[in-house]
Amino acid sequence: MEARFTRGKSALLERALVRPRTEVSLSAFALLFSELVQHCQSRVFSVAELQARLAALGRQVGARVLDALVAREKGARRETKVLGALLFVKGAVWKALFGKEADKLEQANDDARTFYIIEREPLINTYISVPKENSTLNCASFTAGIVEAVLTHSGFPAKVTAHWHKGTTLMIKFEEAVIARDRALEGR
């Protein structure tokens, strides 16, 4: 009876609590996400409504992702500049969600408030087949909701939308107050 309690330590007990293993099977994720899309699709009447519902669900996930990342980071500092927050999203958040960094981060030439995160082959759209009548549907609206929540809860309120351009492009449009604060910080 005592023998089962005195064996060598199991690998499970030796894992660190701070950085748990966060890998999820791709097939399990694909199944869960496709069911989520089907569930939302059965309750809406247009592609715009479906994308809005996916974005709303993404915002709920984004708030939790930010909490988890901040709790796990050792010596994490709070970003005060827009570029730092965007690099955090492109790097740490993307790695936590998809296992790699986003492909590109760009700023719009004509607008200081607009930035783009470009993902050539987004994992979120890989296993979703879209019927012809819904050809404008981009399920990356879910990812846009996640990014919007991470930025908003970090103190950088923004509106994030997903578009088809060079793969999938997330267009991030910050509120004017965020850009004004960023310029004031640069002036110090």
Curated annotation (Swiss-Prot):
Pfam family, one: TRAPP
Keyword hit for Cytoplasm: no
Family per record: Belongs to the TRAPP small subunits family. BET3 subfamily.
Modification type Phosphoserine: residues: S10
Oligomer and partners: Component of the multisubunit TRAPP (transport protein particle) complex, which includes at least TRAPPC2, TRAPPC2L, TRAPPC3, TRAPPC3L, TRAPPC4, TRAPPC5, TRAPPC8, TRAPPC9, TRAPPC10, TRAPPC11 and TRAPPC12.
Source organism per UniProt: Mus musculus
GO CC field: cytoplasm; endoplasmic reticulum; TRAPP complex; TRAPPII protein complex; TRAPPIII protein complex
Entries under PANTHER family matching the protein: 41-2 PROTEIN ANTIGEN-RELATED (PTHR20902), TRAFFICKING PROTEIN PARTICLE COMPLEX SUBUNIT 5 (PTHR20902:SF0)
Gene3D superfamilies: Trafficking protein particle complex subunit 3
SUPFAM superfamilies listed in its UniProt record: Ligand-binding domain in the NO signalling and Golgi transport (SSF111126)
Major localization listed first in the record, in broad terms: Golgi
Highest taxon in the source lineage: Eukaryota
One GO BP annotation of this record: COPII vesicle coating
Annotated function: May play a role in vesicular transport from endoplasmic reticulum to Golgi.
This protein's encoding gene: Trappc5
Subcellular location: Golgi apparatus, cis-Golgi network; Endoplasmic reticulum
UniProt keywords, alphabetically: Endoplasmic reticulum, ER-Golgi transport, Golgi apparatus, Phosphoprotein, Transport
Name by which UniProt lists this protein: Trafficking protein particle complex subunit 5
Claim: Transport is one of the keywords in the record: yes
